[in-house]
């Protein structure tokens, strides 16, 4: 993740970053656990040029520009053992998105700090939400982290990034002992805290 993110710069195509990421994984003995995704600016997550070379709605061309907010999400598996990692960067490090990037990292850390066996999931989400709100952002409520198991990227348990309450059907129960999780809090400058186009 660091190798690729440190080499991203203005003028690169979205597709070239994705190809570079997947080549690096294979060159080092792994395989992509899912198509590498590169989501730019108001695209919150899960966009990959592996599915299309047609720009998404509102994007003229898929070339990185100085000041773009880029979310790079890479999954690796080695003999079925999966790692799911993401990083958010600003192209050119102009400081336009520093607070938002910091808030996402701090929300992740706050969630991890809460994740002890027996902790209700809604308390994990509440910790992430509080960090986002204190920093002036909204958590994205319909994107979440997830459990990882061998050969299973989404293993049934979701990790909330907002205070969903103790009775939310998607986040009932408590943090189990021995689980492996991708903790993925998303935040937004928008008011709804929801991703509107999930296609």
Name each model feature, range by range.
Residues 1-199:
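Active-site neighborhoods and metal-handling regions in enzymes and metal-associated proteins
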């Amino acid at each position: 993740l660091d190798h690729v993110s440190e080499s991203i710069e203005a003028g690169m195509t979205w597709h070239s970053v994705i190809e570079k990421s997947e080549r690096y994984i294979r060159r080092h003995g792994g395989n992509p656990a899912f198509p590498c995704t590169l989501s730019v600016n108001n695209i919150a997550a899960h966009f990959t040029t592996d599915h299309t070379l047609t720009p998404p709605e509102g994007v003229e061309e898929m070339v990185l520009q100085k000041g773009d907010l880029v979310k790079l999400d890479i999954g690796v598996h080695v003999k079925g053992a999966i790692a799911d990692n993401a990083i958010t960067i600003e192209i050119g490090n102009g400081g336009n998105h520093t607070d938002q990037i910091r808030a996402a990292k701090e929300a992740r850390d706050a969630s991890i700090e809460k994740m002890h066996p027996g902790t209700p999931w809604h308390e994990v989400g509440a910790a992430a939400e509080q960090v986002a709100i204190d920093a002036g952002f909204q958590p994205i409520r319909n994107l979440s982290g997830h459990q990882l198991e061998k050969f299973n990227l989404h293993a049934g348990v979701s990790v909330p990034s907002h205070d969903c309450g103790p009775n939310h059907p998607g986040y009932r129960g408590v943090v189990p002992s021995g689980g492996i999780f991708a903790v993925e809090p998303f935040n937004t400058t928008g008011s709804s805290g929801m991703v509107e186009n999930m296609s």
